[in-house]
Design a protein with these regions (language model features):
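Short, composition-biased motifs enriched in small/polar/acidic residues
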Residues: 253-326
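Beta-strand-rich interaction/scaffold domains
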Residues: 47, 111-209
Length: 326
């Protein structure tokens, strides 16, 4: 029996003219061998689209507009959780296979009265939240934020002044975020920055799921893995800090997916998303007992990603098509 992966990798198209339920007249059979993937991986580096801090000591405040995101435990044993979300739309071709994902963070400040090294972990968020745009009212206490307004994330709420609360203040494992640590890193001081949460199967799986199902992309929660010890709190550069922003570096293998195959008059047509800077060749053959694939058309590398339309006159009762990256 054909596996799901095999079905996804090969698309069989059989156009038929339906005259009556149960009666079909098929003049020809066409097969699309959906893609021949490039063996070379591509890399993209993304900035977060939203990030903020959940502040236990000021549970109704927001800090979404600050130059930093706080995470860890303060000297007074109060906790901070950092939230980050990256948007993959338009950055990675749909159906691409992700092979690596690294998150790079820079520590921009440590506790004034000393610090303890600590292991921090990334947890995949399971619910949505609002970034907000607040900074601290009191410049001498920049990590406390200021009172949230509607739809801004706080320690208590995913969206302030709505019914969308965290399951428990500060967010709860299982309900608000996955208890699984997707990646971890020991954090020391500013001088050891930047810190890379190196690729793991779980981290890659998080990002792959966001690519395949964008509606599940709520980002990551960053926290100290142990929230018993104090002096582990750190400020990490946020997206507003253009000198020290978080960076998500993704390595992937683009997949070429054929779209909208159809017959129009005496022509067979299909299209696919031609990636910027990549040339392609559409090929055909009428039989696998013949001498091989023949070139139908060459597609020059476009300057930007664009839909390429392939046309062929119907001159055979059976034909196979594929698109390759030379």
């Amino acid at each position: 029996m054909e596996s799901e992966d095999e079905r996804r990798g090969r698309f069989r198209y059989q156009p038929c003219l339906w005259l009556h339920p149960g009666i079909a007249l098929c003049g020809f059979t066409l097969f699309l061998l959906n893609f021949v993937s490039c063996c070379c991986a591509a890399t993209v580096t993304l900035l977060p689209v939203v990030d903020t801090t959940l502040i236990e000591t000021e549970p109704t405040n927001n800090l979404g507009g600050a130059l930093f995101v706080n995470a860890g435990v303060t000297q007074n044993f109060t906790k901070n959780h950092g939230l980050f979300r990256f948007d993959l739309a338009g950055q990675i071709p749909p159906h691409s296979q992700l092979t690596r994902a690294d998150l790079i963070l820079e520590v921009t400040h440590i506790p004034r009265d000393g610090y303890a090294s600590a292991e921090f972990g990334l947890h995949r968020l399971l619910v949505s939240w609002g970034e907000g745009n607040k900074v601290a009212d009191d410049p001498s206490h920049p990590g406390l934020g200021s009172p949230a307004t509607t739809n801004e994330a706080t320690w208590n709420d995913r969206f302030a002044f709505t019914t969308n609360h965290w399951s428990v203040p500060g967010a709860a494992p299982i309900y608000d975020y996955s208890p699984v640590v997707s990646a971890r890193q020991t954090i020391y001081d500013v001088g050891s920055s930047p810190y890379t949460f190196e690729s793991t199967p779980a981290l890659v799986a998080n990002v792959q799921s966001w690519l395949d199902n964008p509606q599940t992309n709520f980002g990551w929660l960053l926290k100290a893995l142990s929230e018993v010890e104090n002096f582990t709190s750190r400020r990490f550069g946020s997206r507003e800090d253009t000198n020290h922003p978080p960076l998500l570096v993704i390595e992937f293998i683009p997949s070429l997916w054929i779209q909208q195959p159809e017959i129009s008059g005496n022509q067979f047509r299909f299209q696919f998303a031609a990636q910027a800077g990549q040339s392609y060749r559409a090929e055909f053959r009428d039989s696998f007992s013949s001498n091989g694939w023949m070139t139908l058309t060459n597609i020059p590398a476009p300057a930007t990603t664009t839909d390429a339309l392939i046309l062929d006159s119907l001159s055979s009762t059976k034909r196979f098509y594929r698109v390759v990256e030379p």
